[in-house]
Amino acid sequence: MSIIGIGTDIIEIFRIKNIVYNFKDKLAERILSVQELEKYKVNKNPIKFLAKRFAVKEAASKALGTGISYGIKFNQIELYNNNLGKPKLRFLKYALQKSEEMKCKSIFVSISDEKLYACALVILEK
């Protein structure tokens, strides 16, 4: 296996809090997949939930080599957890097409948050 993409991102949680305060669920509806949106609506800490997903999606788009542009949208990158709680990524639509073009076989994701920040690292391998 060899690394074909690396992306990282850090976001100030307060920034997400301000956006949610001013625009309600507009950001969540824009960046989350249908499954993520369902979890967001019942999450005990929706601001951190949203901040972590924002960071992961930015990091994943950077690992794909495009950033959020060139047809890749936030809701085409889906974060979920396996039965042990390990974070996993699923690419949809154009993000999936891009990962297939890169011959991506494995996706590694790490997420962390503290009081002020959420950060993520995504590594793609072929």
Curated annotation (Swiss-Prot):
One of its GO terms (molecular function) is holo-[acyl-carrier-protein] synthase activity. Its cofactor is Mg(2+). Mg(2+) binds at residues 9, 58. The keyword Lipid metabolism applies. It is found in: Cytoplasm. It comes from the Bacteria. Signal peptide: none annotated. The keyword Acetylation does not apply. Its EC number is 2.7.8.7. One of its GO terms (cellular component) is cytoplasm. InterPro entries: 4-PPantetheinyl_Trfase_dom, 4-PPantetheinyl_Trfase_dom_sf, ACPS, Ppantetheine-prot_Trfase_dom. It catalyses: apo-[ACP] + CoA = holo-[ACP] + adenosine 3',5'-bisphosphate + H(+). Transfers the 4'-phosphopantetheine moiety from coenzyme A to a Ser of acyl-carrier-protein. Belongs to the P-Pant transferase superfamily. AcpS family. This is Holo-[acyl-carrier-protein] synthase. The lineage of its organism: Bacteria, Pseudomonadati, Pseudomonadota, Gammaproteobacteria, Enterobacterales.
